[in-house]
């Protein structure tokens, strides 16, 4: 077992602070409209260039074990803030550094860390209450575009694309980000339900130019059974042939004689049919089939509920205005299911989302919700190089998450001004070391605004003082042009959720660091050098061995 080094009290906290400082110094240069880029060496390939705080934080590993522990804790704050709110990683890092720095000074001078923490927690809760009072709901496309633009580092084109996507598919709709073939950004909106299963045979294709199978006004057979024999589905095929309408088969799988017969009859023009595998796996597949059944007004043919393919009738089939299938995806447009049943299914999924404790399950449930309640929008990001593409795609992902956060909880004025406004309204009657904790938060809360001003080349102290002294709630500093403006009027806004989570996470990690009394870390041992092999030249005589 490796030897361990133990550090106590001020010695431990000072080394932790050094790690926090180094990480914050690297991350904070990216903050604001005039933030700078950070160039990151990769173990292979070209270096990456980014202005994304969490991307910078994730790359940092320090040589000193204790300093690295401090850096890793703050890195975790940046990641958690990004996961929960999609943005605010740099704000959280700058706040954590500011709070830890102020707190360390007071604790070194003799303040009780536990009492200080209690005061910090009370101040944070009060500031968040005031932030909520200062917030307003996002009402229109213009405000959504403003939030997205700021989160995408002032890229107005990305902002307008996200706003347009959200307008078309709704706040519960699926918006995905993909790489474009060229250098231009574009938005594609898929109406209806799309799932990631393509045709089982290219012989089902009806449009050879686009390699798509398009079925107009089709019946839809849904089953969780594997179809291997033609006799299983013969009665249904005869029924759909008499109606003169095409048939889409969605099953666990279709193989052997069944698939061959379908393809041959399709090529002969006897049947207008297409077949795809059911989406998802296991229990999730069953639920997704039920979603499609609800949307199309059909039933899932399943032996679990006593239905077999041989006994199924036309009445069990779903219907839609159109189905488009390519090699990767199937899209059902304008399903003929009852609106009331669809709404009931949506409400059921919402309840499951609220009840689940698994992030993965929540994500999959939200995807199902979006497919039922809205369409699917795809933002295609274009760039001239692979390095630019990665950086731009990261920005679009951040902007998308931040925009969803804004729609969820509302917006506050941006540029770090909302935190200062909220803190100014808080008046707590505390005493002793609790009061010190409260004052630490009040002093550190201006750190984001100061950093934004500093990155733009302005005097941070003067800017922060001017904002603090002005009584107008919407008054703030526009770092892009150096003017003091009405932040809402100028569209300089942040999601409330981003500001709230950044502050909560920053205070949480700072409290942990300030109440740390000992650190235990491994002592790095110098590995012995490899032995010199030059003296083994005499082994050359072994070359004759084959």
UniProtKB/Swiss-Prot annotation:
Keywords: ATP-binding, Chaperone, Cytoplasm, Isomerase, Nucleotide-binding
Top-rank lineage group of the source organism: Bacteria
EC number, as in UniProt: 5.6.1.7
Residues at which ATP binds: 30-33, 51, 87-91, 415, 478-480, 494
Catalytic activity, reaction form: ATP + H2O + a folded polypeptide = ADP + phosphate + an unfolded polypeptide
SUPFAM superfamilies from the UniProt entry: GroEL apical domain-like, GroEL equatorial domain-like, GroEL-intermediate domain like
Keyword Isomerase part of the UniProt annotation: yes
Signal peptide: none
Cell compartments where the protein resides: Cytoplasm
CDD domains linked: GroEL
Matches recorded under PROSITE patterns: CHAPERONINS_CPN60
GO process annotations (BP): protein refolding
GO CC entries: cytoplasm
One GO MF term attached to the UniProt entry: ATP binding
Enzyme category, top tier: isomerase
The keyword Chaperone is annotated on this UniProt entry: yes
Primary residence: cytoplasm
Quaternary structure note: Forms a cylinder of 14 subunits composed of two heptameric rings stacked back-to-back. Interacts with the co-chaperonin GroES.
Purpose of the protein: Together with its co-chaperonin GroES, plays an essential role in assisting protein folding. The GroEL-GroES system forms a nano-cage that allows encapsulation of the non-native substrate proteins and provides a physical environment optimized to promote and accelerate protein folding.
Family membership noted in the UniProt record: Belongs to the chaperonin (HSP60) family.
Protein name according to UniProt: Chaperonin GroEL
Species: Wolinella succinogenes (strain ATCC 29543 / DSM 1740 / CCUG 13145 / JCM 31913 / LMG 7466 / NCTC 11488 / FDC 602W) (Vibrio succinogenes)
């Amino acid at each position: 077992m490796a030897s361990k080094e133990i550090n106590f009290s001020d010695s431990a906290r000072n080394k932790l602070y050094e790690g926090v400082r180094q990480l914050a110094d690297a991350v904070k240069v990216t903050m604001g409209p005039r933030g700078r880029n950070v160039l990151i060496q990769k173990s292979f390939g070209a270096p990456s260039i980014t202005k994304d705080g969490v991307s910078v934080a994730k790359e940092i590993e320090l040589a000193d074990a204790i300093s690295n522990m401090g850096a890793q804790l703050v890195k975790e704050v940046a990641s958690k803030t990004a996961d929960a709110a999609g943005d605010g990683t740099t704000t959280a890092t700058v706040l954590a550094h500011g709070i830890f720095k102020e707190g360390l000074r007071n604790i070194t001078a003799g303040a009780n860390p536990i009492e200080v923490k209690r005061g910090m927690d009370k101040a944070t809760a009060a500031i968040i209450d005031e932030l909520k009072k200062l917030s307003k709901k996002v009402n229109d496309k213009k405000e959504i575009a403003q939030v997205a633009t700021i989160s995408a580092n002032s890229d107005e084109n990305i902002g307008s694309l996200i706003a347009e996507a959200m307008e078309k598919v709704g706040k519960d709709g699926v918006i995905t980000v993909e790489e474009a073939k060229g250098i231009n950004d574009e938005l594609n909106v898929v109406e209806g339900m799309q799932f990631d299963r393509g045709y089982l045979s290219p012989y089902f294709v009806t449009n050879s130019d686009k390699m798509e199978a398009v079925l107009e006004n089709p019946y839809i057979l849904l089953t969780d059974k594997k179809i291997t024999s033609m006799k299983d589905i013969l009665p249904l095929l005869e029924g759909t042939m008499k109606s003169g309408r095409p048939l889409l088969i969605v099953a666990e799988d279709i193989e052997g004689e069944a698939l061959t017969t379908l393809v041959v009859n399709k090529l002969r023009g006897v049947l207008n049919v297409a077949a795809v595998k059911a989406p998802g796996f296991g229990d999730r597949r069953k639920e997704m089939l039920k979603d499609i059944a609800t949307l199309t007004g059909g039933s899932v043919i399943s032996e679990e509920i006593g239905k077999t393919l041989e006994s199924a009738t036309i009445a069990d089939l779903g219907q839609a205005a159109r189905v488009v299938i390519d090699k990767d995806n199937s899209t059902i447009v304008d399903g003929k299911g009852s609106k009331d049943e669809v709404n009931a299914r949506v409400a059921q999924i919402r309840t499951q989302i609220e009840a689940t404790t698994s992030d993965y399950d929540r994500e999959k449930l939200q995807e199902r919700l979006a497919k039922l309640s809205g369409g699917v929008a795809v933002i295609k990001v274009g760039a001239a190089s692979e390095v630019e593409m990665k950086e731009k795609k990261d920005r679009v992902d951040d902007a998308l998450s931040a925009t969803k956060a804004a729609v969820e909880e509302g917006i506050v004025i941006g540029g770090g001004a909302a935190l200062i406004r909220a803190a100014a309204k808080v008046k707590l009657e505390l005493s002793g070391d609790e009061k010190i904790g409260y004052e630490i938060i009040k002093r550190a809360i201006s750190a984001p605004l100061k950093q934004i001003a500093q990155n733009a080349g302005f005097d941070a102290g003067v800017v922060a003082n001017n904002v603090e002294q002005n009584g107008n709630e919407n008054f703030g500093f526009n770092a892009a042009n150096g003017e003091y403006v009405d932040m809402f009027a100028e569209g300089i806004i942040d999601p409330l959720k981003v500001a709230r989570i950044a502050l909560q996470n920053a205070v949480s990690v700072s409290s942990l660091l300030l109440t740390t009394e000992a650190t235990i870390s491994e002592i790095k041992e110098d590995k012995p050098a490899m032995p010199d092999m030059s003296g083994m030249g005499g082994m050359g005589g072994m070359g004759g061995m084959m």
